[in-house]
Amino acid sequence: MDVTWTVKYITEFVGTALLIIMGNGAVANVELKGTKAHAQSWMIIGWGYGLGVMLPAVAFGNITSQINPAFTLGLAASGLFPWAHVAQYIIAQVLGAMFGQLLIVMVYRPYYLKTQNPNAILGTFSTIDNVDDNSEKTRLGATINGFLNEFLGSFVLFFGAVAATNIFFGSQSITWMTNYLKGQGADVSSSDVMNQIWVQASGASASKMIAHLFLGFLVMGLVVALGGPTGPGLNPARDFGPRLVHSLLPKSVLGEAKGSSKWWYAWVPVLAPILASLAAVALFKMIYL
């Protein structure tokens, strides 16, 4: 199937919006006062984010389903995605995250108005390390703990994501085919070869489905295992876009308990996943490609 880059940008927007609807929607259901699942199991949030990654991947994986600026940058830095489309992808992802968050606010507004905890309200938008107790003396500890947590979780996510989408077709075979085509004068990259295999190879649909299921359960596992300190981050668009929405919406929408958007912490869930992605994709490429 031939897909234009414009369609890919739109798909990244839609996919990221779905991620936020499923993921932050689950957080809102648990954190906001008066909801059906208020103060219930953290597993609800794990399932929300797992499905939030899995469903766009299953629905749009044959077009594009990166839905994460850190992953896009990691792939581009390792030569697995064209730099010419990185900015457009990231813009689409951030806007998609903002749109998805606005839909969550629309649905949950009565419960935002009931909630008296400003951190609970912010937590339905973006992440914050639990070391923070709203005093300046805890900011350094929250920043360090948050950065370590985000880096570790993101590294595992991105290494697993690249592995899941490459190993099924044999990374050595992809490298051999790329080199062969270049030797024949073709201007191709490993990502070009891999994309064509995903579309054309016999049994590709089954392999892609397995990979997408794996990614969903991987995210769910990471949220359950490492979400305790910061909440589910692992994605700059997932944090920055909704945090921006939080800062822009007035108290008439989010309630009188709306507090600070905590921009002092905002660089952590942006930079840590990006650095983790660069390291994870580079390591995978060094070992397997």
From Swiss-Prot:
Keywords: Cell membrane, Glycerol metabolism, Membrane, Repeat, Transmembrane, Transmembrane helix, Transport. Belongs to the MIP/aquaporin (TC 1.A.8) family. PANTHER family: AQUAPORIN OR AQUAGLYCEROPORIN RELATED, AQUAPORIN-9. The keyword Transmembrane helix applies. One of its GO terms (cellular component) is plasma membrane. One of its GO terms (biological process) is glycerol metabolic process. A motif (NPA 1) lies at residues 68-70. A motif (NPA 2) lies at residues 235-237. It is a multi-pass membrane protein. It holds the Pfam family MIP. InterPro entries: Aquaporin-like, Gla, MIP, MIP/Aquaporin, MIP_CS. It is found in: Cell membrane. Mixed channel protein that transports both water and glycerol. This is Glycerol facilitator-aquaporin gla. The chain crosses the membrane at residues 10-30, 41-61, 87-107, 151-171, 209-229, 264-284. It comes from Lactococcus lactis subsp. cremoris (Streptococcus cremoris). It comes from the Bacteria. Aquaporins contain two tandem repeats each containing three membrane-spanning domains and a pore-forming loop with the signature motif Asn-Pro-Ala (NPA). The keyword Lyase does not apply. One of its GO terms (molecular function) is glycerol channel activity.
